[in-house]
Amino acid sequence: METSQGWLVACVLTMTLVWTVAEDVCRAPNGKDGAPGNPGRPGRPGLKGERGEPGAAGIRTGIRGFKGDPGESGPPGKPGNVGLPGPSGPLGDSGPQGLKGVKGNPGNIRDQPRPAFSAIRQNPMTLGNVVIFDKVLTNQESPYQNHTGRFICAVPGFYYFNFQVISKWDLCLFIKSSSGGQPRDSLSFSNTNNKGLFQVLAGGTVLQLRRGDEVWIEKDPAKGRIYQGTEADSIFSGFLIFPSA
């Protein structure tokens, strides 16, 4: 046991002595810096860095490139507003003649318009130069106005008018008409009476009238004296011959 302890002490002393000797042997003064070495070889590429912030817009614009290929068609758009009507196209060629129609039903004369009137002078009022026939004898469908002396057309067509007026003096009368408020050509009839006897001045005509046209009798202011009494009557008449197609 004592031998082992002695051996351990000897080893410790030996190691202490060696460390002390080595420290004294390796210590030397500091040397000067050596010359720079040659550049080393490039290292391996590093890892990819993080994405940087967007840069500012460039000042210059690049040259315009070539036209690209057409893109794919997009979805159909919404219908637009209806446009204005276009101008009428040219008249086309006449079509072939159609087939003959079916024969219609027979007409009923009772359903046809039949305007007609007759009026005489009895106690007429004075209305300028218009000759008033105030007493109505016939006024089918009421075309004649006895307070104005005018016939007003309600059924377009061809009409016959006539008058017979009694006088003991020179007399000049006119059959006058208007259309759309505008006067038309008038027809004049005159009679000279030198003996102061009853004479009849008569006249008549056929007129084509439109709705609203008017017909009446006028007198010449200088030769318009008409007999008025119970011995003879003056009359004004008119009726539709046939309506316009």
Curated annotation (Swiss-Prot):
4-hydroxyproline: residues bearing it: P39, P45, P54, P79, P85
PTM annotation, UniProt: O-linked glycans are assumed to be the Glc-Gal disaccharides typically found as secondary modifications of hydroxylated lysines in collagen-like domains.
Source organism (scientific name): Mus musculus
Gene3D superfamilies listed in its UniProt record: 2.60.120.40
Entry-linked Pfam families: C1q, Collagen
Protein name as catalogued: Complement C1q subcomponent subunit A
Annotated positions of the 5-hydroxylysine modification: K48, K67, K100
Keywords, alphabetical: Calcium, Collagen, Complement pathway, Disulfide bond, Glycoprotein, Hydroxylation, Immunity, Innate immunity, Metal-binding, Repeat, Secreted, Signal
Domain called C1q: residue spans: 110-245
Reported function: Core component of the complement C1 complex, a multiprotein complex that initiates the classical pathway of the complement system, a cascade of proteins that leads to phagocytosis and breakdown of pathogens and signaling that strengthens the adaptive immune system.
Biased composition (Low complexity): 79-99
Gene Ontology CC entries for this record: collagen trimer; complement component C1 complex; complement component C1q complex; extracellular region; extracellular space; extrinsic component of postsynaptic membrane; extrinsic component of presynaptic membrane; glutamatergic synapse
Cited PROSITE patterns: C1Q
Quaternary structure annotation from Swiss-Prot or TrEMBL: Core component of the complement C1 complex, a calcium-dependent complex composed of 1 molecule of the C1Q subcomplex, 2 molecules of C1R and 2 molecules of C1S. The C1Q subcomplex is composed 18 subunits: 3 chains of C1QA, C1QB, and C1QC trimerize to form 6 collagen-like triple helices connected to six globular ligand-recognition modules (C1q domain). Interacts with CR1 (via Sushi 24 and Sushi 25 domains). Interacts (via C-terminus) with CD33; this interaction activates CD33 inhibitory motifs.
Example GO biological process: synapse organization
Signal peptide boundaries: 1-22
Gene: C1qa
Regulation: The C1Q subcomplex is inhibited by sulfated molecules, such as triterpenoid sulfates, heparan sulfate, or chondroitin sulfates.
Residues the entry annotates as binding Ca(2+): Q199
Superkingdom of the organism of origin: Eukaryota
Subcellular location: Secreted; Cell surface
Glycosylated residues, chain numbering: K48, K67, K100, N146
Region Disordered: start-end pairs: 28-114
